[in-house]
């Protein structure tokens, strides 16, 4: 196959990547500026260098305050304001940022939320219905994963199921039209331990939603599907994999023969999905543990085996993440980084050979690492947590109706987590009212050491973005805050 000819602006579109030809990028941008009459010809070179430096900066470090970027360029405020205006007139530079090493932050989270206006609402402390609502319907879990923050043995009383499921249906009814991905089922505890999950999924589908369930699939048996036919109305089932054999599963979950059962459940689900011609998507979340990067090849073989069982229906997606637990600086050692890069290259080659239609989501840090950048996971500490959190962006609701401000706080009996409950949904109090009351009364939580573990990656990104936007506004850059909008 002949490669397409590179356009004159291609160097600019790639300028944020490690090893990019920055000289060629500056030349291309300078030509664009001069040809379009955007700057005088004698200023095109200097202006282009500044613009390319901005693209490199925000393509790698998306949470940089504007004032910091201005100081880095060494220009005054008027000159910087002109540069920001010019940046928006060179689409190739925006492409460079969105496809750079930090592109997953921009495309997966920041820009979609900007376009919905939820950051504006959070900064203005305006009560709006959350952009994302996680329903945590599971009363218990059959695993005891060593990394899970769940208190051993903690569970919800089964007597809470009927009232809890009625409450969940009322929350689903509140979700505004226009955002079909606004709600998902997760935990907390295992969603499939709730015998009413299928009914809730069907109710969500009837409401115009496309919900995903995050599950370990241990209970995704044919009998469960027969008892809960509404599960077939889900948009997707995302199974968290805790290994690729029984030994690895037992080390992680504490349960014998768990992998074997999950694998057989998924094989049978593949067969049933094909027989029913169901549009439901099936995929995985897989964490690459230290020293196990080579297991990515076995992951592809595992998926290929499931494809064989699907009679033409193949696994739709896999989300790959690196284990950053215990890394306070959010960085990987150089040796481990090199090992992981090599493993990812081999993984992608095996995917092309055996599972060519598989969609792969590498998340934030691994996306950077794949480009050759020095991957560093964002870390929010108690000092930078926002007392007001961000209920306009996301909340989580457990079986009791408690509305949690962070995704990893929604576990029963978890020490300190109740401080992050904004309120409770009841027959007399809607989710809309809980959020409105929390925001309007100026609800705040003073973070203490360890509270950062109540936040997942999404919460951390949202917090970093809000801190950045607030800093930009305070520095007098309200009209350009956040760089890209």
UniProtKB/Swiss-Prot annotation:
Q: Keywords on this record?
A: 4Fe-4S, Antibiotic biosynthesis, Iron, Iron-sulfur, Lyase, Metal-binding, Oxidoreductase, S-adenosyl-L-methionine
Q: How does it assemble?
A: Monomer.
Gene3D superfamilies found in the cross-reference section: Aldolase class I
**What is catalysed by this protein?**
dTDP-4-amino-4,6-dideoxy-alpha-D-glucose + AH2 + S-adenosyl-L-methionine = dTDP-3-dehydro-4,6-dideoxy-alpha-D-glucose + 5'-deoxyadenosine + L-methionine + A + NH4(+) + H(+)
Function as written in the Swiss-Prot or TrEMBL entry: Involved in the biosynthesis of dTDP-alpha-D-desosamine, a sugar found in several bacterial macrolide antibiotics. Catalyzes the SAM-dependent deamination of dTDP-4-amino-4,6-deoxyglucose (dTDP-viosamine) to yield dTDP-3-keto-4,6-deoxyglucose. It can also catalyze the oxidative dehydrogenation of the non-physiological substrate dTDP-D-quinovose to dTDP-3-keto-6-deoxy-d-glucose. It can also deaminate dTDP-3-amino-3,6-deoxyglucose.
Q: What is this protein called?
A: dTDP-4-amino-4,6-dideoxy-D-glucose ammonia-lyase
Matching PANTHER family, A to Z? Answer: PQQA PEPTIDE CYCLASE, RADICAL SAM DOMAIN PROTEIN
Q: What is its EC number?
A: 4.3.1.30, 1.1.99.-
Note on file?
A: The reaction starts by the transfer of an electron from the [4Fe-4S] cluster to S-adenosyl-L-methionine, spliting it into methionine and the radical 5-deoxyadenosin-5'-yl, which attacks the sugar substrate.
Q: What InterPro entries does this protein map onto?
A: Aldolase_TIM, DesII, Radical_SAM_PqqE_MftC-like, rSAM
Q: Which family does it belong to?
A: Belongs to the radical SAM superfamily. DesII family.
What the record notes about the co-factor is: Binds 1 [4Fe-4S] cluster.
Output the SUPFAM superfamilies linked to this UniProt entry: Radical SAM enzymes (SSF102114)
Q: Which prosthetic group or cofactor does it need?
A: [4Fe-4S] cluster
Enumerate the transmembrane spans: none
Q: Give the Pfam families listed for this entry.
A: Radical_SAM
The UniProt annotation places [4Fe-4S] cluster binding at: 141, 145, 148
MF terms (GO), sorted A to Z? 4 iron, 4 sulfur cluster binding; ammonia-lyase activity; metal ion binding; oxidoreductase activity
Q: Tell me the Gene Ontology biological-process terms attached to this UniProt entry.
A: macrolide biosynthetic process
